[in-house]
């Protein structure tokens, strides 16, 4: 019983140090913008149809590097941009937490597309938009085909999680919170 408590305290302490280290070094607007440009380039280079998908959206979030780490208790954080008509209009932070069997760290990129003006406005007017509470995000998994067709997507908000190798499968954004930040 006492050993479990020690492990929990250790896990929470390590997680706090990991995420604290991420937030100590505030990322500059230029650095976030550069990372977002690179993430969009990787996305459009590796997934056929993605450029058309971005063009048809009312706006989209780009998180070039979201760090997920955990040891029993997990957390994720990252900073990104909201783009409308391909231009950055605001900066955002994503955060989430989870409990369960997990150990390690992973960096990933995310693009979340608002396919309607109503979905985009709902997001922009919130003070901290939470997936599963304020709206849902349909994650797109293209499998081995590495192509997407925007004509078949009917969801108002769709997300893509990827790394330099392409889209990543079996992931979730449930419980993630997106908060506007000043840069």
Set out the residue ranges of the language-model regions:
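Small-residue-enriched, tightly packed secondary-structure blocks
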Residues: 23-183
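Bacterial N-terminal signal peptides that target proteins for export
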Residues: 2-11
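C-terminal motif of bacterial Sec signal peptides marking the signal peptidase cleavage site
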Residues: 18-21
């Amino acid at each position: 019983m006492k050993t479990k408590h020690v492990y929990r305290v250790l896990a929470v302490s390590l997680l706090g140090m990991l995420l604290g280290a991420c937030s100590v070094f505030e990322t500059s607007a230029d650095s976030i913008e550069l990372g977002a440009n690179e993430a969009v380039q990787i996305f459009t280079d590796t997934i056929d149809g993605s450029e058309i998908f971005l063009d048809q959206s009312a706006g989209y979030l780009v998180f070039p590097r979201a760090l997920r780490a955990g040891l029993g208790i997990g957390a994720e954080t990252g900073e990104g941009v909201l783009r409308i008509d391909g231009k950055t209009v605001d900066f955002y932070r994503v955060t989430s937490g989870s409990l369960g069997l997990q150990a390690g760290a992973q960096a990933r990129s995310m693009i979340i597309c608002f396919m309607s003006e109503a979905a985009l406005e709902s997001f922009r007017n919130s003070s901290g938009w939470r997936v599963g509470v304020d709206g849902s995000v349909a994650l797109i998994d293209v499998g081995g085909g590495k192509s997407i067709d925007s004509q078949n997507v009917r969801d108002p908000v769709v997300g893509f999680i990827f790394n330099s190798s392409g889209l990543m499968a079996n992931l979730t954004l449930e419980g993630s919170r997106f908060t506007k930040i000043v840069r």
